[in-house]
Amino acid sequence: SNTALRRYNQWATGHFM
């Protein structure tokens, strides 16, 4: 349902981790 949220999660993981 929230594909955009998953995309953001992947991006945030690479930026914040």
Swiss-Prot record:
Q: Which GO terms describe its cellular component?
A: extracellular region
Pfam families under this entry? Bombesin
Which biological processes are named by the entry's GO terms?
Answer: defense response; neuropeptide signaling pathway
| UniProt keyword list | Amidation, Amphibian defense peptide, Secreted
Q: Does the keyword Methyltransferase apply?
A: no
The record's tissue-specificity note reads:
Expressed by the skin glands.
Q: What is this protein called?
A: Ranatensin-R
